[in-house]
């Protein structure tokens, strides 16, 4: 069986202007063999959904350091659902309080990574998500 290249969209939603972490992760995932689409700063939920659709990505990764994750994630999920991307898994990186993790997972977030997360672990988790999605 030939393994295909996993396509991931890395997006910075909302007004958060800190993009260093997103760029580091994007570069690390590219080095790990992923095809990475980086959308840049200040993306709206609709922009993220449109990019995910146009780029035919396997996973959407959000970098959220603003603390607005509980507002942004449902808006992005809604935009993705409207674009018929309900089956595209979403992961989040950023400063996410432990109390919010179960709520985000209930919204369909398939991975949450905080500061200091190992890029190898993130890549392995993404591979697992894509493989399990393909099998279901």
Per-range role (PLM):
Residues 1-5, 85:
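Short, flexible coil/linker segments at domain boundaries that flank nucleotide/cofactor-interacting
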Residues 22-132:
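Cofactor-cradling patches in redox/metallo enzymes
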Residues 1-2, 134-136:
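Basic/polar N-terminal segments that are highly enriched at the extreme N-terminus
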Residues 11-15:
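N-terminal pre-triad scaffold of radical SAM enzymes
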């Amino acid at each position: 069986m030939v393994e295909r290249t996993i396509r991931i969209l890395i997006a910075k939603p909302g007004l958060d202007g800190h993009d260093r972490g997103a760029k580091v992760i994007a570069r690390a995932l590219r080095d790990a063999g992923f095809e990475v689409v980086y959308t840049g700063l200040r993306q709206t939920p609709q922009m993220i959904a449109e990019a995910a659709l146009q780029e035919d990505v396997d996973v959407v990764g959000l970098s959220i350091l603003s603390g607005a994750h509980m507002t942004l994630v449902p808006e992005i999920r809604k935009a993705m659902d409207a674009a018929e991307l309900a089956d595209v898994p979403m992961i989040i990186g950023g400063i996410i309080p432990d109390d919010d993790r179960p709520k985000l997972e209930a919204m369909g977030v398939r991975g949450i990574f905080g500061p200091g997360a190992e890029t190898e672990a993130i890549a392995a988790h993404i591979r697992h998500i894509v493989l399990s999605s393909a099998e279901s």
